[in-house]
From Swiss-Prot, chain B:
Function as written in the Swiss-Prot or TrEMBL entry: May be involved in the biogenesis/assembly of dimethyl sulfoxide (DMSO) reductase.
Organism expressing this protein natively: Halobacterium salinarum (strain ATCC 700922 / JCM 11081 / NRC-1)
Protein name, UniProt field: Putative dimethyl sulfoxide reductase chaperone
Gene this protein is translated from: dmsD
Induction and repression of expression: By anaerobic conditions. Its expression is under the control of DmsR.
Keyword DNA damage among record annotations: no
Annotated knockout phenotype: Cells lacking this gene fail to grow under anaerobic conditions using either DMSO or TMAO as terminal electron acceptors.
The entry's keywords: Chaperone
Similarity annotation: Belongs to the TorD/DmsD family.
Amino acid sequence: DDSDTAGDAVTSFLGEDQVVKTACSPNCRGKCPLDVFVRDGQIKKVEQQVPAAKTFKRGCTLGMTHLQRVYNADRLKYPMKRTSWSPDDPQPDQRGADAQFERIAWDDALDLVADGIQRAKREYGPRSLLWHSGSGDGGITGYRRLKELVGGLQDDFTYGIDTNVGQGFNRVTGEGGVFMPPTNTADDWVNAETIIIWGSDIFASQFQMDAEWILDAKRNGAKLVVVDPVYTNTAEKADLWLPIKPGKDTHLALAMMQYIFEHDHYDEAFLRSRTNAPALVRADDGTLLDPASVTATPPEDGIVVFNTETGSPEVVPAETNGPFALFGEWTIDGTTVHTGLTALREQASSYPPQAVADTAGLAAADIETAADWLATRGPGGIMPSYGVGRYLYGHVFGQTYATLLALTGDYGRHGNIHAQHPSYDGSYLETGDWNDPDGAAGVDTYGYNRVLDLLANGDPVQTKFMYGMNSNMLGNQFPERDRWLDAMSNLDTVVWADIYHTPTTRQADIILPAAHWFETEDLLTTYTHPNLSYRTKAHDPLWEARDDYYIMAGLAQRLGHGDKFPDDKHDVLDRFVKNDDRLSWDALRETGTVATDETPTVAYTDEFGTESGRITVYDDDAPVEEGPALPDDGVSLEVPKPLEARTADDWAHADEYPLLFMQKHSKWRIHSQWANVPWLREINTEPQLDIHPKDATRRGIDDGEYVRVHNDRGSVVVRAKYNDGIQPGLVNTDQGWWARDFVDGHLQDLISAETAKVGRTFAFYDCRVEVTRAADEHQSNEYTQHNPRGSSGTATDGDSS
Amino acid sequence: MTPATRNNDSAVAVADAFDDTGDGPPTAARFAALAACWRQPDDDLQAALAAETDTTVDAQSLRAEYTRLFVGPGPSQSPPYESVYRDGERDADLGPVYGSSTQAVARWYSEYGLQPAASESAPPDHLATELEFAAYLREHEGAETLEQFLTEHPRNWVESFARRVRDADPKPFYRTLLNVTVDTLARADTPL
């Protein structure tokens, strides 16, 4: 067959490559600067770029495969509209797998979108518009500017997706927000003596940023502990792996506290000066003793402590050390009080390592070793991720590990760690009023946890028009997918911009083809490394794809805001560069990056952001959590209490659905991006269910057979993969597969969209299933023969049911 | 293509394309007409079809069918570009756009001072563009040159493309167009 060699024969090996500076920007947060080699106007190769802050050279396999994302035949090529949709007769029930589209001109597409926005505002009010953007890219698009000008509702991660761990941490420290809290920057981690990576496979899913620093610390003598139910790429690097049962993380942290209390390994000075451990708590109602009852003019942030030298209570401000009792009980003016730390120790005493070992499937000695290393080896830290918060009450873990690190005094010192993907503060742009323009109508924000109600029930308003971009929400991380599809049928019009035809654009009425990142000029900020990147356009967008900026500008023009969007995006970027003494076009163009402040930072050196300026190891203002499997009147969280829903052994349906179901992040994708890259699909061919051979053989399932993973919400058919690295009782299918990659059903159908009253966060891993051998019709090799593997695709479509 | 012009008299061209059922070498007009048919259906094409067939062609359904088969979105598309069928690394995959065969086709065009019209945003190895170029060669160059181009390019992938399109169960117009195109490319085999 000469067709194989014909192509090679004409490839020119003469001529010169042009090296174009650009950057990657999915939601791994890496934002890795890349060199793109262009010859004869086409991209030939991608390499990591050495950025200005050289020690932060990064890049991964995914970044190297962009060639197959740019030149993917499956890209969205032209604006399209669903043939059965029209402004007057939208027929939302015609969306989905069988929907037909027709190509339309850009002008017509933008007219339809702009007219739709005006019409929805006119007929149903401004709050009938819903703006949605996920985490698919980080460039300058003008999306936020246009949205602010036009008004409406916007949805948001807060609360809803991965808002548990940070929320719990923030509640007792006053620091951070709902996502990962502040931490010492990565270049300081080498000073750590003990690092506990808790529920995160950073050597697989974020290895481009954090992994090397962890290895540096290990080389420098740090002990690495990994807490993970799965023997991961990260676990294999550990000095000590704690193969915890899913959902028992708070139990484990309390057991470590118990060990630390019992062996007097807590940091007394830190507890006295920087936490409310010595604060006096009233035994009758659990509130802190009122400073005004002790002194007439208490300092604003004062707490009442018991001075063991004077033998009397006194009020002390934040950051004050002294001979304050850490434990004890007294009666002051007839009121019985004890210290906050007494309450915490009392709580921890119920979780001795021996007992928790049993509950959590661990060895008591291992729990003690981990606690001992953290408490006695010198500065260290705990590095959780979002995975450990993907349980209904996962915010309690945030409170718990913040408290544990307070016991060991691991705040404000070199070598302390509190989170993965640390923040470098210097990589920002001087955007002026770009995101907050004059004349903004403003938008109301709804967390993803509330959007389903908003769409389904018109509560509190009925949305009619949705504009989405940078997101494959129906492909990933939106649980109970069927409910979202139903809810979206209340929308007259769904407009979506993307590079590819995703499971989400398939539900759209108007599809707008967005440019690949390499086809845009842009400025990129990041917080995971101290570089600011410039994207030079490698070539124009293919077909009629457009940089999102020009889509926004086209809409702005039609909506009366054209004067606020320069015709040339470069003029916007130029404004940001000119605003900023650190930046110059010469440097950006020549090197691709500008180094921002790269001084290693130690976090938490100042007063904490709580009312008292101290970590509240006893939270007198604790919320009461309510939800499934909790007592009717809820549970108050002054001190960490292990709360469990579906992972609990006594969960009501535990017998019917005995297996816990996790959806780990994969090294082959960032969320659902890269799922359509042939090179990657050669290795990672299809979704699989990681299952322990014991669980499989008990169910008569052979390695490689197709299985139906099911519960009372839905099911998905995937291939079983015997995996000794996953514990019995737990199964896993990696997240981020597209609907078309499943033989039948969908991963998201199995997961509940229910959230807890306080947590308000989707609990992807708080999921129980049963697994059975799939029907014979699914056991043929037909599926694998026609496996879409990215760019082609005729397999059974998960959307069809 | 520029500077060569497409045959704008689509009605005549389409008629010619479908009526020319002889065994002789296809005319330049036939290549040009086929090329016109492989583009996104426009009003000219609809008028041409209306004029030449008894039934009225529904322009919207023709456009929808063209979108479904050749533009996407979705899995039933057959991207009408040479590299997609020739430059993939494995048979099971669709190849990339802008592959090495795309470059080879573009080099043919530039040898003759031609390039795809600015209005065509598609890669240069679009089936319609290759047919337009065949029309140019048929008109301006010798038979051997045309033969060489057809052998190096459209004949090398049109069968794979046709198989994939047929799997998507095309409506009559595109089924016929596909047959006529495959047949035309084969017929040109006969030396002039």
